[in-house]
Structure formats: C-alpha cells, structure tokens
Swiss-Prot record:
<dbReference type="GO" id="GO:0051537">
    <property type="term" value="F:2 iron, 2 sulfur cluster binding"/>
</dbReference>
<feature type="binding site">
    <location>
        <position position="266"/>
    </location>
    <ligand>
        <name>[2Fe-2S] cluster</name>
    </ligand>
</feature>
<keyword id="KW-0408">Iron</keyword>
<dbReference type="GO" id="GO:0004076">
    <property type="term" value="F:biotin synthase activity"/>
</dbReference>
<comment type="similarity">
    <text>Belongs to the radical SAM superfamily. Biotin synthase family.</text>
</comment>
<feature type="binding site">
    <location>
        <position position="59"/>
    </location>
    <ligand>
        <name>[4Fe-4S] cluster</name>
    </ligand>
</feature>
<keyword id="KW-0479">Metal-binding</keyword>
<comment type="pathway">
    <text>Cofactor biosynthesis; biotin biosynthesis; biotin from 7,8-diaminononanoate: step 2/2.</text>
</comment>
<keyword id="KW-0411">Iron-sulfur</keyword>
<dbReference type="GO" id="GO:0009102">
    <property type="term" value="P:biotin biosynthetic process"/>
</dbReference>
<comment type="function">
    <text>Catalyzes the conversion of dethiobiotin (DTB) to biotin by the insertion of a sulfur atom into dethiobiotin via a radical-based mechanism.</text>
</comment>
<feature type="binding site">
    <location>
        <position position="66"/>
    </location>
    <ligand>
        <name>[4Fe-4S] cluster</name>
    </ligand>
</feature>
<keyword id="KW-0004">4Fe-4S</keyword>
<dbReference type="InterPro" id="IPR007197">
    <property type="entry name" value="rSAM"/>
</dbReference>
<dbReference type="InterPro" id="IPR013785">
    <property type="entry name" value="Aldolase_TIM"/>
</dbReference>
<dbReference type="InterPro" id="IPR024177">
    <property type="entry name" value="Biotin_synthase"/>
</dbReference>
<keyword id="KW-0093">Biotin biosynthesis</keyword>
Length: 351
C-alpha cells in the first residue's frame, strides 16, 4: 500500500489488510497513522468532551465489564434520573472547563416512554449552551431515533464493544445484531454516530481486527470512534483479566486512524491508568479526542488540571466551537428551572 493513497476513506478493508497494519514495525505504523492524521485534522488540536451519568446503576444488561450491571455486586449505589436543571448546570461547568461536547449516559437497556421526554429536554438545553450534544441510552426504536433527531441531537453513542465472534463471551442480554440495528436507526435519522469498543477484555488480536473491520465497513464511517482500555472493577467478571500490552493498545488506535481517516478517534476510558508518555504516543497514533473531567460515568479519569498540563507540554490545544455568552448560558438554565416548576422532573428511573 502506497503512503500516497492511504488517506482516502475506504469501506472494503479485508481482515488480512488490517492484520498487516497491526503487524507493521511499530515506528512504521506510527508514521503512517500520523501521516493520515495530518492530512485530515489539525495536528495539534484535540476535541474535548465531558461525560455525565444522568441515571446510574441497576442496568438489566449483563455486560461483563460494567459496574452498572444489576447482575453483579459492585457496591455501586443506583441513582435516580437527574433533574434537567442539574444536568444543565453540569454542562455549563464542563463548558467553562474547556469541553466542546457534552455526553449524557443512562444505564438502560432501552429508554422508556416515561423517561424519554426529560432526556429530550436535556439535549435541547445542552445545545442552547453552545455545546455539541451526545447521549447513550441503550437500544432505540425508530420513533425514538426520530425524536432525538428532531430536537437536534448531534451524536448517539452505541458501542459494538468487540468483534462479532467474541461478543457472546462478554454480553448475552443483547445481540450483536441488536446493536447494529440501533446504529442503523440512528444513522437513518440523520444523527452522527459515536461507536467504538473496549480493549483488554481477554480478546485476541483477531477480535480487535474484527471490531475495526466492522467499524470501517460502515458507510459512512462513525464520526467518532472511542477506543477504551478496560477499567477493571471489583465484582465484575472481568476484574482479574490479564492486562493488554500497552503497545498493542497504541497499535489499535493507529490502525483505527488509518482505517477511518475522517473520524475523531477518542482516547476514552482507561486513561487514568496510563502515564503521560503512553497518552502522548496515543495522540501520535492519531487519537484526537478525549473525555475531560474526573469521572467517566462511574469510573475514574485524570483530573482536568493534569490534562491541561499534559496538553501544554505537548503543545496541544482543545478544539473550539462557537462561543455563547455567560448571559446566554444563564438564560438557558433559567428556562429549564421554569419548566421544572411546571412538571415533575425527578423520579425513580432504575430500570
């Protein structure tokens, strides 16, 4: 493969071609990935997102990596659906700290009709602050995808997690095809996709190849591709799984960048366990998005000040979006306070 034609998006990557990329000498792979990255993105900019759990715990799914699953005893305290006003206050704080995208996650198999209107209000409020909006709510039906699109949702996160072949070893309560069907509904509704996977769950390299191949065959590619390192949580079935080699994780990011040259590749969960040198290599490999803040749903994340210090050392700047004045932010939150006074926005939403 010529270095001169590797940046054009393709949707027909074979398993053998992707395996060959993984097998390149590390420096050659890094050079190729960085070349693709520079052809498509500002090389020293990273998109910064903040992730908030708007409803925590008691999830009926049995994902073996997840502390929010109701199947495992992780001593995680379940929490009710957050008030819309509180969510918008968190969004405003995230923007103040430099985030350009605000992601909201709910531990559901799928959203109920009781819960859904409140999530729609959260999305509208986040967008009124000048932030990109993203939610992860589980499986969606056609009507729910349409309603999310109508309120202007920018991104829907629904990860494939791993290869189709390894998937049943990790999750049994939702099929791989279920996930693909939700992704199709989201795409058909005009919402951008945030879709990636988790590395270090005991999978083999062929499974990382299979996951990236599946993602790269989506037309168009997911606009955002989170690459997570497993965060081991006591009480989950994967708490004692062997660690993934750090260089293999970096290779996975580099291959993702080559396969999906126009996508934001997010260095996602697991950063708290990485030193600055490892994170720098991930950025060199083509990662150009992170989650910013001390917590990702229920797991730890590097402190915001440490991230900004790392950015300064590397000469990296956060991507910028259109600025909204402080008055506009206050007005958006105040509008939600009025709505809250007119309806009950805080209730049990544990399943």
């Amino acid at each position: 493969m010529s270095i001169n034609n590797i940046s054009a998006p393709r949707f027909d990557w074979t398993h053998a071609e992707i395996k060959a990329l993984f097998d390149l000498p590390f420096m050659d792979l890094m050079f190729r990935a960085q070349t693709v990255h520079r052809e498509n993105f500002a090389p020293n900019e990273v998109q910064v997102s903040t992730l908030l759990s708007i409803k925590t715990g008691a999830c009926p799914e049995d994902c073996k990596y997840c502390p929010q699953s109701g199947h495992y005893n992780t001593e995680l305290e379940k929490e009710k659906l957050m008030e819309v006003q509180k969510v918008l206050e968190e969004a405003a704080l995230a923007k103040e700290k430099g985030a350009s995208r605000f992601c909201m996650g709910a531990a559901w198999k799928h959203p109920s009709e009781k819960d859904f209107p409140y999530v729609l209000e959260m999305i509208k409020g986040v967008k009124s602050l000048g932030l990109e909006s993203c939610v992860t709510l589980g499986s969606l039906n056609d009507d729910q995808a349409k309603r999310l699109s109508e309120v202007g949702l920018d991104y829907y996160n629904h990860n494939l997690d791993t290869s189709a072949e390894f998937y049943d070893s990790i999750i049994t309560t939702r099929t791989y095809q279920d996930r693909l069907d939700t992704l199709s509904r989201v795409r058909d509704s005009g919402i951008k996709l945030c879709c990636g996977g988790i590395m270090g769950m005991g999978e083999e390299q062929k499974d990382r190849v299979g996951l990236l191949r599946q993602l790269s065959q989506m037309t168009p590619h997911p606009e955002s591709v989170p690459i997570n390192m497993l965060v081991k949580v006591e009480g989950t079935p994967l708490e004692n799984v062997d660690d993934l080699d750090t260089f293999e994780f970096i290779r996975t990011i580099a291959v993702a960048r080559i396969l999906m040259p126009k996508s934001h590749v997010r260095l996602s969960a697991g950063r708290q366990g990485m030193n600055e040198q490892t994170q720098a290599l991930c950025f060199m490999a083509g990662a150009n998005s992170i989650f910013y803040g001390e917590k990702l749903l229920t797991t730890g994340n590097p402190e915001a000040d440490k991230d900004m210090a790392l950015f300064a050392n590397l000469g990296i700047n956060p991507e910028k979006r259109e600025e909204h004045s402080d008055a506009a932010v206050a007005e958006a939150i105040a509008a939600q306070v009025v709505k809250q006074e007119e309806s009950k926005l805080f209730y049990e939403a544990s399943v």
